């Protein structure tokens, strides 16, 4: 609606001046909940009030009328704002904070008693732009992302920034990998062009990934505009100052900087230039695999039971965030992986140093986020103190290394220790200026040390010794006048005054004594000196707070100039924390250093699942370790055996071992030789996707299709029960053909678990496939799951035994056994296997299927060479094929 329609709807012309001010500001922020500061409360009106009262659980009241209808209103105390903002941000609302820009007294002085206090929006808070500790998690990054998908290109540009830590990155992402990349980053908010609103991509982002999308008009991403924004923001003359970036990346970076500028108003973040990321530098793990393996969250989205919760024994907040990033993005460069492993091994070999360093790290603060708050004028004296204490502790950590090693530190350790050297200029600045007990709120005063500035000392002297100054002035006037009975008194009418008895009035001859009042018994005077003292006493508290704010802002500017140093220091501390953490868990849990090879080795001896092992240890139970020996000659393990025997755990543990190894950690195994894994795919279990109208089987097939399309020779595929969501013959056929495709086309490493025992004969003609099963012990009708993976194939699933363990009624179990016996007798009469092993052709079954004639479409496909088609020719051909298909 336009402004005239808006004014009419809300009765603008009949509203009070204050309400007109509210409506003016609200119209400029229609996409936000507007929190309007009125005294000690932030108020909301109309639809905002109705919505917020429900979300926040606060009372809905009324204020005035709009025509015949009362205006809904609700409010929250200003001092409790962050608590309420937390709820609004969790619900993905966009909130505009409208503050008073002057005091009521200043408004009266400006425009009389009817003047409305000046107000304006000082900040817009969105899920991707929060920096307050209460509004963000300590471990996960809080990314705002901008995704630019150019037309007729197969690569998108993605820029993502964490405002709370002042970090920003940009990466080119293959179009097929966009959802996987977003799943890696888990941005709280994604900027997307309006023309993509109805696209499948936008639908998948919001429904499948459940991420918030903020749409912007197409011009928001215009390349020329975005380039100018970047140049202005970083004060550069040439875009090459950022690095070699594409037009799409320019649009992604520029749009994020513009959005941050719009939402943060005057408090522009001090972001470094974007770090350009190579998409292929880290392992690809798709959305469903991250969910199945429970890498950073469990299957319900929580932390308990995730791989992160098991591995995270970091002692700093920034260390926890770095570990989260490591687990989200395992490396694919074996040289860099080994560099990390060297650091882990150093700390593992020097556990005495590790223990001392970890104790000191506990005393450091999250200076990344402290620095951001300071640079954006939302910091406090305590943030500065946190930086000072961290500088001091970092220096102590550095001394531990040099005390033990002197100058013989390994170069890779010296590199991360060197930034710990204390910046004395910065340390001394904070030490000399900020009170040790500085409050969070600058308005409370007491932030700046009295000794830091003479005026601060003078004002505090006035505040603390006001009566003493009055006494000194009284004694001075007694000497000057010779009147011993002279007093200095105070009342609410004339303030401070010199009080002299009437009989002594003739002794006042000095013109500096100004007559104020005569009473029956006394004459009252003042002096310029006394007036100044009174003014200073009255205003001292206000003046000292104002002066402290000025000095604090100057100190913050000087600290901000050291941003690069502080970021490097924070990075060093977080890295040391993570590698000490790796050493700690390795020593506590008997992990070993993995060895990386240039082939397809995946040779794990006595491997364990770290999360399951941790859970069993709490129950004082032991985890049964297993080997896994994949190689060029034996790329595929087909694993059969009963449910509950440990197949799924075995599949997951090997994928997890690959991830742990490639983040630079030791692994839960006796030994591990691994050929670098570029992608991990896991299809384990499935659930109906009712929102998208997909059955279990359709969801399973979509995941399997994506795996087969995106895997490379260096990938690791984990498949569990492919084909189980349909009829037996269909399921066996699909599982068979998938195995063949992986073996013959992809030629990558694969662990394939199945209940289709018919597949075990495939080792006769798939030379790189071997059968493995789960060892069990049978005693009559009872079975014992040994959880050991052994060579061989299972011929039974023992499903009825599992059903009995689950507590099904005995009558149901007995009946199931009778039915199973009949099926087994019938199968024996017809021949044990329905599958033919005599032929290696595409036909799975002994019964020959009727031959189908090729359709015209199939004949047409045979003539097409997709590598020689231009994008335009491919599109035209697609329309032609669609038309022919409809005719057929």
Swiss-Prot record:
ATP binds at residues 641-648. It comes from the Bacteria. GO terms for molecular function: ATP binding; ATP-dependent DNA damage sensor activity; damaged DNA binding; mismatched DNA binding. InterPro entries: DNA_mismatch_repair_MutS, DNA_mismatch_repair_MutS-lik_N, DNA_mismatch_repair_MutS/MSH, DNA_mismatch_repair_MutS_C, DNA_mismatch_repair_MutS_clamp, DNA_mismatch_repair_MutS_core, DNA_mismatch_repair_MutS_N, DNA_mismatch_repair_MutS_sf. Pfam families: MutS_I, MutS_II, MutS_III, MutS_IV, MutS_V. PROSITE patterns: DNA_MISMATCH_REPAIR_2. The keyword Mitochondrion does not apply. Transmembrane segments: none annotated. Keywords: ATP-binding, DNA damage, DNA repair, DNA-binding, Nucleotide-binding. GO terms for biological process: mismatch repair. Belongs to the DNA mismatch repair MutS family. This protein is involved in the repair of mismatches in DNA. It is possible that it carries out the mismatch recognition step. This protein has a weak ATPase activity. This is DNA mismatch repair protein MutS.
């Amino acid at each position: 609606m336009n402004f005239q329609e808006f004014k009419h709807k809300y009765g603008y012309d009949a509203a009070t001046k204050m309400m007109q001010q509210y409506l003016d500001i609200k119209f400029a922020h229609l996409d936000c909940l507007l929190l309007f500061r009125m005294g000690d409360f932030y108020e909301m009106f109309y639809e905002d009030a109705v919505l917020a009262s429900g979300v926040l659980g606060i009372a809905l009241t009324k204020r005035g009328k709009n025509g015949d209808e009362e205006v809904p209103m609700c409010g929250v105390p200003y001092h409790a704002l962050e608590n309420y903002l937390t709820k609004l941000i969790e619900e993905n609302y966009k909130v505009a904070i409208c503050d008073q820009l002057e005091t009521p007294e200043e408004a009266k002085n400006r425009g009389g008693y009817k003047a409305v206090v000046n107000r304006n929006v000082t900040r817009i808070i969105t899920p991707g732009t929060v920096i307050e500790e209460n509004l963000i998690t300590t471990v996960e990054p809080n990314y705002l992302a901008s995704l630019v998908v150019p037309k007729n290109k197969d690569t998108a540009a993605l820029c993502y920034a964490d405002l709370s830590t002042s970090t920003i990155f940009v990466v080119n992402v293959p179009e097929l990998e966009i959802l996987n990349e977003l799943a890696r980053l888990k941005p709280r908010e994604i900027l997307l062009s309006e023309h993509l609103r109805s696209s499948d991509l936008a639908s998948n982002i919001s429904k499948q990934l459940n991420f918030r999308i903020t749409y912007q008009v197409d011009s928001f991403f215009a390349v020329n505009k975005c380039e100018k924004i970047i140049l202005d923001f970083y004060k550069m003359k040439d875009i090459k100052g950022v690095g070699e970036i594409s037009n799409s990346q320019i649009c992604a970076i520029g749009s994020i900087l513009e959005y941050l500028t719009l939402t943060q108003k005057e408090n522009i973040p001090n972001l470094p230039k974007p770090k350009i990321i190579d998409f292929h530098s880290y392992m690809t793990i798709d959305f469903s695999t991250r969910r199945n393996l429970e890498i950073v969250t469990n299957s319900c989205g929580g932390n308990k039971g995730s791989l992160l919760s098991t591995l995270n024994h970091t002692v700093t907040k920034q260390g926890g965030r770095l570990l989260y990033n490591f687990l989200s993005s395992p490396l694919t460069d074996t040289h860099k992986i080994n560099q990390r492993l060297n650091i882990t091994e150093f700390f593992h070999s020097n556990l005495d140093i590790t223990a001392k360093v970890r104790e000191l790290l506990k005393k450091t603060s999250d200076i990344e986020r402290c620095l951001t708050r300071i640079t954006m004028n939302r910091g406090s004296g305590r943030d500065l103190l946190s930086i000072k204490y961290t500088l001091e502790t970092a220096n102590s950590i550095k001394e531990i290394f040099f005390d033990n090693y002197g100058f013989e530190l390994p170069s890779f350790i010296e590199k991360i220790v060197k930034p710990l050297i204390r910046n004395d200029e910065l340390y001394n600045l904070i030490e000399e200026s900020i009170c040790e007990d500085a409050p969070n709120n600058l308005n409370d005063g007491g932030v700046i040390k009295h000794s830091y500035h003479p005026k601060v000392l003078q004002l505090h002297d006035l505040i603390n010794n006001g009566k003493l100054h009055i006494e000194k002035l009284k004694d001075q006037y007694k000497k000057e006048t010779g009147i011993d009975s002279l007093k200095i008194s105070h009342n609410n009418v004339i303030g401070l005054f010199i009080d002299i008895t009437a009989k002594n009035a003739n002794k006042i001859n000095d013109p500096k004594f100004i007559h104020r009042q005569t009473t029956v018994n006394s004459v009252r005077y003042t002096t310029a000196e006394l007036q100044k003292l009174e003014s200073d006493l009255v205003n001292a508290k206000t003046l000292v707070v104002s002066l402290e704010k000025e000095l604090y802002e100057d100190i913050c500017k000087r600290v901000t100039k050291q941003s690069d140093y502080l970021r490097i220091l924070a990075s060093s501390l977080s890295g040391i924390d993570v590698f000490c953490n790796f050493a700690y868990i390795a020593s506590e849990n008997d992990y070993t250093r993995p060895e990386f090879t240039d082939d397809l080795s995946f040779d794990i001896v006595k491997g364990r699942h770290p999360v399951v092992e941790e859970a069993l240890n709490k129950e004082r139970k032991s985890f049964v370790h297993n080997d896994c020996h994949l190689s060029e000659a034996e790329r595929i393990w087909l694993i059969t055996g009963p449910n509950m025997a440990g197949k799924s755990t075995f599949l997951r543990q090997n994928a997890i071992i690959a991830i742990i190894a490639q983040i630079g950690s030791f692994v839960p195994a006796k030994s591990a030789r691994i050929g670098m894994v570029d992608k991990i795919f896991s299809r384990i279990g499935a659930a109906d996707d009712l929102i998208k109208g997909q059955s279990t089987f359709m969801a399973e097939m979509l995941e399997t299709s994506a795996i087969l399309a995106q895997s490379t020779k260096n990938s690791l595929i984990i498949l569990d029960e492919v084909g189980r969501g349909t009829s037996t013959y269909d399921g066996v056929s699909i599982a068979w053909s998938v195995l063949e495709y992986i073996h013959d086309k992809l030629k990558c490493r694969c662990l394939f678990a199945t209940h289709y025992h018919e597949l075990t004969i495939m080792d006769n003609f798939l030379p790189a496939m071997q059968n493995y099963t789960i060892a069990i012990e049978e005693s009559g009708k009872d079975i014992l799951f040994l959880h050991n993976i052994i060579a061989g194939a299972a011929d039974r699933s023992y499903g009825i035994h599992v059903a009995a363990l689950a507590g099904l009624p005995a009558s149901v179990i007995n009946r199931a056994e009778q039915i199973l016996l009949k099926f087994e007798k019938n199968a024996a009469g017809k021949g044990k296997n329905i599958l033919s092993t005599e032929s290696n052709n595409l036909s799975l079954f002994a019964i020959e299927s009727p031959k189908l004639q090729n359709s015209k479409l199939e004949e047409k496909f045979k003539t097409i060479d997709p590598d020689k088609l231009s994008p335009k020719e491919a599109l035209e051909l697609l329309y032609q094929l669609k038309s022919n298909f409809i005719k057929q």
